[in-house]
From Swiss-Prot:
Species, as recorded: Malassezia globosa (strain ATCC MYA-4612 / CBS 7966)
Glycosylation (residues): N343
Name of the featured protein: GDP-mannose transporter
Gene: VRG4
Keywords from the UniProt entry: Cytoplasmic vesicle, Endoplasmic reticulum, Glycoprotein, Golgi apparatus, Membrane, Sugar transport, Transmembrane, Transmembrane helix, Transport
Side Lumenal, residues: 82-90, 151-155, 201-287, 343-360, 412-413
Keyword Transferase annotated: no
């Protein structure tokens, strides 16, 4: 018996037993091997956990980058197509164009649903009541944007869109407990400065002429002598002077005051100033209307983004749901507003869609409807995987290629003002991005000091403040899959 036992102890373990980490008589193994095996298993588990966490963070980052790039491409293409569609002073059917775009978008998404490519959540009355205000605001966002784009060049339009970022940031400060750091505030100052620089050619001359004309109007009332205003209203003054001195070829500046002439001269000057002011108003009304529409668009866009972020949490909509129901619920609003505001007569259609450009315009509208699907989806995607402020920041950084596209496709003039304005706006976007990055890092360091967690940028998403990047698997392309 002792010989058998000795022989069994000398039999080496087979490969399967070695692979399983035990021998045939592992119960008599030395106790010193147990802590080593436990340590080895814990190291393997730690490495595996870190690998999976880094993989998920990499997936989230790649998904966020994909969302940002997709939104940039959609934004540039939609702006160029819409500018081509509504460009021109005589185009008056913006709401009809938006109605066609939304209808094309709904048809495309519904076709994708019927082919089984995506799934769309079934709509109920609760979701309709929750989401209908969002769709109504989207109508006003797109409409005011199209009107501003109709009256403004693309570089100026893109610069003023930066002001939306400021409104969104302060909205997040009030609604989502956001925070504005000094560097972020500096970027806001640069954004406002870029807008002032870009708009200076439209704002400065009218102000200077008004002050200049008022000063000389007061002087004319006392002296009775019309004074030149450097080419402004010269035709009116010359005719007035010729009427009072028909036998002289003297210029208005050489006319000497005489008794009793103050009243007719004052009347002539008043008429001259009123006609010149009307002419100046006609020349500047086109760009002035653009600034008014742009201001309205910035305010409504900021409200839309902030309210949309809240409602997405309430409804639990996915990206395709958001895009589909945004456009679907916008159709009745657009139809009602178009019938109420726009004239659907044959003459109006001939005026807005002339025969020589009709086929091109119809194709552009259909193409813009297709692009509307893309931009609606990428907007919701970008907001979901990043934040509403980050989404608007991406739009700010996108202004440089967008402005270049306007100069390239529409021949917008390259002036020192709009060039400097675009450059300052682009720098403001970079400063803002750096400021938000430092804010995220500081928040993570503070959170790690409080919890003892790692300060790595790939740490848990709980360290991110409200409204910032959230590193989870939401970065994947958010499409629905059909349930088996």
């Amino acid at each position: 018996m002792s010989m058998t036992t000795s022989r069994e102890r000398n039999v080496p373990p087979d490969d399967n037993e070695i692979e399983l980490g035990r021998s045939r008589h592992s119960d008599v193994a030395p106790e010193s091997e147990s802590p080593q095996a436990h340590l080895l298993n814990s190291d393997v588990a730690s490495v595996t956990k870190n690998f999976m966490r880094n993989a998920s963070h990499a997936t989230a980052n790649s998904g966020a980058i994909a969302a940002v790039l997709s939104y940039c491409i959609a934004s540039i293409s939609m702006t160029v197509i819409n500018k081509f569609t509504v460009s021109g002073e005589k185009f008056t059917m913006n709401l009809l164009v938006l109605l066609c775009q939304c209808s094309v978008g709904v048809a495309m998404v519904y076709a994708a649903k019927c082919m089984g490519w995506i799934q769309i959540r079934t709509l109920n009355m609760r979701d309709v009541k929750t989401w209908f205000p969002i769709s109504t605001m989207l109508v006003f966002v797109i409409y005011t944007g199209s009107k501003a784009l109709q009256h403004m060049d693309i570089p100026i339009y893109t610069i003023f869109k930066n002001l939306t970022i400021i409104l969104i940031a302060y909205g997040e400060l009030l609604w989502f407990n956001g925070r504005i750091t000094p560097m972020v505030f500096l970027s806001f100052i640069l954004m406002v400065l870029s807008s002032i620089i870009a708009a200076w050619p439209d704002l400065a001359p009218s102000t200077a002429k008004t002050l200049y004309s008022r000063a000389f109007e007061s002087l004319n009332l006392y002296t009775g002598v019309p004074h030149a205003t450097e080419g402004w209203g010269e035709g009116v003054r010359t005719e007035a002077a010729s009427a009072m001195h028909p036998h002289t070829a003297l210029s208005p500046l050489s006319v000497k005051p005489y008794v009793g002439a103050a009243t007719p001269l004052a009347a002539a000057v008043a008429q001259q100033n009123s006609e010149a002011a009307a002419s100046s108003s006609t020349l500047s009304s086109w760009s002035t209307n653009g600034y008014v529409w742009m201001l309205a668009n910035c305010m409504i866009s900021a409200t839309y983004v902030l309210v949309m972020r809240k409602r997405i949490k309430l409804t639990g909509f996915k990206d395709w749901d958001t895009m589909f129901y945004n456009n679907l619920l916008s159709i009745p609003v657009l139809l009602f507003m178009s019938l109420l505001v726009e004239n659907w007569s044959v003459e109006t259609f001939e005026h807005n869609f002339p025969r020589e450009k009709r086929s091109t315009l119809v194709f552009a509208i259909l193409l813009s409807g297709t692009g509307g699907v893309f931009i609606s989806y990428t907007t919701a995607w970008c907001i979901r995987v990043t934040s509403s402020t980050t989404y608007s920041m991406v739009g700010a950084l996108n202004k440089l290629p967008l402005a270049l596209s306007g100069m390239l496709f529409f021949g917008n003039p390259v002036t020192p003002y709009n060039s400097i304005g675009v450059a300052v706006g682009f720098i403001a976007g970079i400063v803002y991005a750096v400021g938000k990055y430092k804010q995220v890092v500081a928040a993570r360091i503070a959170n790690s000091d409080a919890t003892g967690a790692s300060t790595s940028l790939s740490s848990s998403s709980s360290a991110a403040p409200s409204g910032e990047y959230v590193f989870d698997l939401k970065g994947e392309i958010p499409t629905h899959t059909r349930q088996q």
